[in-house]
């Protein structure tokens, strides 16, 4: 038993995706696995994930080790709050900032920042310089979120500092999430890097909150500061604002940058899809830039992104704990059992998808979507905890991908689709590309 726990733990820590793939192949869609710090149930079917997140949401709580860890840096934002009543109260306060009309009004911010990045890329192309696509997408999506959220200049040192700190948190916390044997309060080199990064993020966010109190900014953060709950006349405290801002900044740029990087990498290794997308954007974008009004005429760019989100979901897994005895797919779940579910494996489950490992954007034509069980695709979660920023993210990504493909031909050096999993799913190796301007 001890040997098995050690073997499982080593495999899980070094490569959790392959570990879960092997477990799924051997045991099916629901299985228990033993690690040195305890046992856990794994779930790899979308219907079972929907059951956990929607049908039995009240029984499967966020009171898990994963959310305890996430709370250390993200606090109690919408993505991490365990108490359901508090989550509902904060969701009501935050929701108006993400109304469709508000998001649509932010499209010009997205277009401006995308154009600015592409102008920088044009200089790189003329000079023959390479770019790191992952880093470029991270900077772009953070700049967009900073302007939309804060209404501030996204090119200042605060943005660079936050991006650096967020990358450090993602890397160091990803290690700890997989195997939290040494408490974070112990000053190992990794833990010191984590706490230093959290301190940097806090300093930046609190400074901006204080500055915005005396400004006339109309960004989302100003809306959150002024949001009042009708029943209690209460507002978000500074700590609650900090937690929501950290959550939005981290989730709002890490996830979108991961998806955009994956989409461009997948297009590189599937030239027929890349050419089809080029043909689409060439027909629609005569001036080389996509705006919100162009998006309905660019369905294939959305299909490419949706398929990238299926194969490479940035938020690739989640955890819950059974408050009372339950049953998932005929498998008994005793009260107190931690459950880990994988969107990555659910999106590649052969019971739900034909040729699940094949990149095929035509899975997301209107006819294909209408013919498919809508419960098998969960790129933004499910149930009441569905990602509040999903409309923002899809608009941002479609604008960016369409404009990039219209303006540039990217040649990625040694494209490798191997994933690596920290808090978010990323490519294992840097995605380095040369640029050629398209006319």
Predicted regions and their residues:
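Conserved cytochrome P450 K-helix E-x-x-R motif and the immediately C-terminal K′/meander segment
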Residues: 8-28, 203, 207, 288-329
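Cytochrome P450 I-helix active-site segment
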Residues: 1-2, 107-111, 162-168, 217-223, ...
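Conserved cytochrome P450 K-helix/beta-meander segment immediately N-terminal to the heme-binding cysteine loop
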Residues: 341-369
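Cytochrome P450 heme-thiolate monooxygenase catalytic core
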Residues: 1, 61-67, 71, 86-87, ...
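Cytochrome P450 proximal C-terminal region
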Residues: 24-25, 114-118, 164-168, 282-290, ...
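N-terminal membrane-proximal hinge/A-helix region immediately C-terminal to the signal-anchor transmembrane segment
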Residues: 1-76, 81-89, 104, 108-116, ...
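Cytochrome P450 catalytic-core helices
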Residues: 255-280, 390-407
């Amino acid at each position: 038993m001890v040997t098995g726990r050690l073997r499982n733990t080593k495999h899980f820590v070094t490569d959790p995706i392959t570990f879960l793939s092997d477990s799924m192949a051997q045991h099916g869609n629901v299985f228990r696995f033993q690690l040195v710090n305890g046992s856990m149930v794994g779930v790899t079917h979308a219907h079972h994930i929907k059951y956990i997140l929607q049908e039995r949401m009240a029984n499967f709580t966020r009171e898990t080790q994963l959310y305890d860890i996430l709370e250390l840096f993200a606090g109690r934002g919408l993505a991490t709050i365990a108490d359901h009543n508090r989550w509902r109260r904060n969701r009501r306060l935050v929701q108006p900032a993400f109304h469709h009309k508000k998001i649509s009004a932010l499209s010009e911010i997205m277009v401006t920042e995308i154009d600015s990045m592409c102008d920088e890329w044009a200089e790189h192309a003329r000079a023959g310089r390479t770019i790191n696509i992952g880093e470029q997408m991270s900077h772009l999506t953070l700049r967009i979120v900073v302007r939309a959220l804060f209404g501030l200049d996204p090119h200042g040192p605060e943005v660079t500092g936050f991006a650096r700190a967020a990358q450090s948190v993602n890397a160091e916390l990803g290690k700890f999430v997989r195997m939290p044997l040494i408490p974070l309060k112990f000053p190992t080199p990794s833990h010191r890097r984590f706490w230093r990064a959290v301190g940097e993020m806090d300093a930046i966010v609190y400074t901006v909150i204080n500055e915005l109190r005396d400004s006339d900014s109309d960004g989302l953060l100003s809306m959150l500061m002024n949001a009042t709950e009708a029943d209690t006349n209460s507002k978000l405290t500074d700590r609650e604002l900090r937690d929501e801002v950290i959550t939005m900044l981290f989730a709002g740029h890490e996830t979108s940058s991961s998806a955009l990087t994956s989409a461009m990498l997948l297009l590189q290794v599937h030239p027929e899809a890349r050419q089809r997308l080029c043909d689409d954007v060439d027909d629609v974008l005569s001036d080389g830039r996509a705006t919100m009004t162009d998006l309905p005429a660019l369905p294939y760019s959305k299909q490419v992104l949706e398929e990238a989100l299926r194969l490479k979901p940035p938020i690739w897994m989640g955890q819950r704990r059974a408050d009372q005895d339950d049953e998932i797919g005929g498998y008994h779940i005793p009260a107190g059992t931690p459950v880990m579910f994988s969107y990555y494996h659910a999106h590649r489950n052969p019971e739900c998808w034909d040729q699940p490992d094949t990149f095929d954007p035509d899975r997301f034509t209107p006819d294909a979507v209408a013919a498919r069980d809508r419960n098998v695709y969960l790129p933004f979660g499910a149930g009441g905890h569905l990602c509040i920023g999903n409309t923002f993210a899809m608009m941002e990504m479609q604008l960016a991908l369409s404009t990039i493909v219209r303006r540039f031909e990217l040649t990625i050096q040694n494209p490798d689709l191997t994933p690596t999993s920290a808090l978010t799913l990323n490519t294992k190796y840097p995605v380095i590309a040369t640029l050629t301007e398209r006319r």
